[in-house]
Regions:
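Short, well-ordered beta-strand elements
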Residues: 3-4, 22-28, 185-195, 220-222, ...
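Ligand-site clamp/hinge motif
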Residues: 10-58
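Second-shell loop/turn segments in exported
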Residues: 24-26, 82-88, 95-98, 134-144, ...
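Short helices/loops that flank or line small-molecule/ion binding pockets
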Residues: 33-45, 51, 61, 93-94, ...
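Ligand-binding "clamshell"
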Residues: 56-72, 241-242, 255-271
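A structural signal for short loop-to-beta-strand junctions that line the ligand-binding cleft
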Residues: 66-76, 120-123, 317
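Append "and occasionally in soluble cytosolic enzymes with long acidic Gly/Pro-rich linkers
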Residues: 91-209, 305
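Extracytoplasmic/peripheral linker and loop segments enriched in polar/acidic and small residues
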Residues: 97, 144, 217-231, 256-328
Length: 328
């Protein structure tokens, strides 16, 4: 897709009388695997917010060769696995924890960003001032260091201790959990990912096809489709939604305001985290907004309290927070 913007001849200018110097701007979708070639051949003039490590390195090589330049800056956002907390296995916190333990997020972040990013413990960017203020406290949060044993313990503590027929788990195959209605739920997670996505490709090898996922008694099924379809399922909070797992990224505004994303019953609450846990997280997010203007210390404390509770509930699994690069 592409959108064409043309200079408005009726615009009087800003307060200094300045008007646009460029007559036409075309904003177009550029596939990740061809974006650098398009920049090199002049098919595009600017690549904005490049995040993939391989593409960044290719762009930096082009800059070193001459004729191109770049800007880099810390991202006020992060990439994540978003999970539905109202249906399927991911409605149970122990499953969300187990998934985090089964993904080597340090290696994932290093591989995807090419060293231009790092792992975070919640929904924030490493260069946001609150994260810098509370760096030591953030280091004390659960980092979900890769561990099959920790994943298995979470699942056992969560009641995933049965075979399909209700007998004690045999130690191989899919685990099951006995629900309140007497039925047994298989530990099978349905994942919808967008096509031509390098993060999805990396998640296939590092999580979905990771032998330790099978060893833990878990299975993740991947369905690939368009990004438009992904958003349809991502915003569907009904219990009939066939998918519980999505990978995408999110940016944060200034000021940092995420309360609307966790309001119970809201369509913006895409994790569908409800009940006492959801209300608590929402109240903590609201506390930031209710801080007296100018009281940075109180705001940062409220921010950390929200992050700490989020880190335990884990409605999403943080993958990376990275530096953006613009090439031109």
């Amino acid at each position: 897709y592409a959108y064409t913007l043309t200079k408005n001849p009726n615009f009087p200018g800003n307060f200094e009388g300045q008007t646009a110097n460029i007559e036409t701007v075309i904003v177009k979708y550029t596939p990740q695997d061809t974006m650098m070639d398009q920049l090199k051949t002049g098919a595009v003039d600017i690549l904005y917010q490049v995040a993939d490590g391989d593409q960044i390195e290719q762009g930096l090589d082009m800059v070193e060769e001459g004729n191109f330049n770049y800007l880099s800056y810390g991202r006020a956002g992060y990439g994540m696995i978003s999970l539905k907390c109202n249906q399927g296995p991911t409605q149970f916190k122990e499953v969300r924890h187990a998934m985090a333990y089964l993904l080597d997020r340090v290696t994932f972040a290093q591989t995807f960003t090419g060293g231009h990013g790092t792992v975070v413990s919640g929904p924030y960017g490493t260069q946001q001032w609150m994260a810098e203020e509370y760096a030591e406290e953030l280091d004390g949060l659960n980092s979900y260091t890769y561990s099959l044993d920790s994943a298995v313990k979470e699942l056992e503590d969560g009641g995933w201790v049965y075979n399909e027929d209700g007998s004690d788990y045999s130690g191989s195959g899919i685990r099951y959990k006995k629900l309140d209605d007497g039925t047994y739920m298989p530990l099978v997670i349905e994942w919808f990912s967008s096509e031509n996505n390098s993060v999805s490709d990396l998640l296939v090898t590092s999580l979905q096809q990771n032998p330790d996922v099978e060893a833990a008694g878990m299975k993740i099924n991947q369905t690939v489709g368009t990004f438009t379809d992904l958003l349809t399922y991502y915003y569907d909070n009904s219990t009939e939604n066939p998918y519980q797992m999505f990978n995408l990224a999110s940016g944060f505004g200034n000021p940092y305001d995420v309360a609307f994303q966790y309001e119970p019953g809201s369509s913006n609450n895409t994790n569908a985290l409800e009940g006492e846990e959801g209300q608590k997280l929402y109240d903590l997010a609201l506390a930031m907004n209710h801080t007296e203007e100018g009281d940075d210390e109180a705001y940062a404390k409220a921010w950390f309290d929200f992050i700490a509770d989020w880190n335990d509930e884990l409605p999403e699994i943080p993958l990376y927070s990275n530096d953006y690069h613009d090439f031109f």
